[in-house]
Amino acid sequence: MTRAKRKKEHIDHALSTGQKRQTGLDDITFVHVSLPETELSQVDTSTKIGELFLSSPIFINAMTGGGGKATFEINRALARAAAQTGIPVAVGSQMSALKDPDERPSYEIVRKENMKGLVFANLGSEATVEQAKRAVDMIEADMLQIHLNVIQEIVMPEGDRNFTGRLRRIEDICRSVSVPVAVKEVGFGMSRDTAARLFNVGVQAIDVGGFGGTNFSKIENLRRDKAVEFFDQWGISTAASLAEVSSISGDRPIIASGGIQDALDLAKSIALGASAAGMAGYFLKVLTASGEEALAAEIESLIEDFKRIMTVLGCRTIEQLKKAPLVIKGDTYHWLKARGVDPFVYSMR
């Protein structure tokens, strides 16, 4: 099967499998503030990922590219929506364009349609330093995402089976490229142990890519003759991943992703320690169902709803929201206790 056809299958299956509310974010409840002393018009949603300035913490996370006309049109629409709303946009893995120059336009269109905005490049952890540099140059990227997708690869019929040397390659890339490097999971979550190893080799930001959003095990199982369904429920939830990584990150930025679908999910993610949050599957559904203008309108609505939540919590800035008290219950509470992460840090601040 060609890489382009596989990319198209991924999009189709991502839309058909849907997202389940298994992010753990439903286990999170804010402590209500009856006297917030805030005004909606004074709320500042700006944030930073390292030295990159974002007007709001929402961005369009990596989805696709390298699948011919279909992915070209999707990326063009995503880039236009990002430009219209002033949020960053990430492209999907650029390996296909590095191997086949005919696929470059489906990625280059993102920068062409979003000349002044933040654009993130994307490659897998199998990439070399030279490939990383070419991916950044291809779209004049402001940041490089390196994705970790072991479960997807092991389930994928034609996927990788050798995962040795990945950390060393990531370290080499961090030392060599001219832009910040963020490492992201793709829906299976990240432990504090993995995050610590990545920070130690120079990774500037971690995108936890938690369980509960687009499920690449289910997607790849739809492409297999014999499914390996035990991986369909494999992973660490978005909420647990954020709390784990936040416990060791210090002042290094964390990015939330994995099933984030509304402003409340976004606010909870920030309060758990994220500086920004990427949304992919939800935005793809809005785009394919209602079009580019509807997507831009939905992004604007999300930002306004997010401001409302910050207002009632008494938070004028993202840094204040990161300190908002919340209570962790249910499976997320038990996971964190078992892992030695104190959930009461959040409720008693």
Curated annotation (Swiss-Prot):
Q: Name one Pfam family in it.
A: FMN_dh
Q: Recorded E.C. number(s)?
A: 5.3.3.2
Write the record's keywords in alphabetical order, separated by commas: Cytoplasm, Flavoprotein, FMN, Isomerase, Isoprene biosynthesis, Magnesium, Metal-binding, NADP
- Compartments (UniProt record): Cytoplasm
Record has Flavoprotein as a keyword: yes
Q: Which cofactor does it need?
A: FMN; NADPH; Mg(2+)
The similarity comment for this entry is:
Belongs to the IPP isomerase type 2 family.
What is the protein name stated in its UniProt record? Isopentenyl-diphosphate delta-isomerase
Identify the gene encoding this protein.
fni
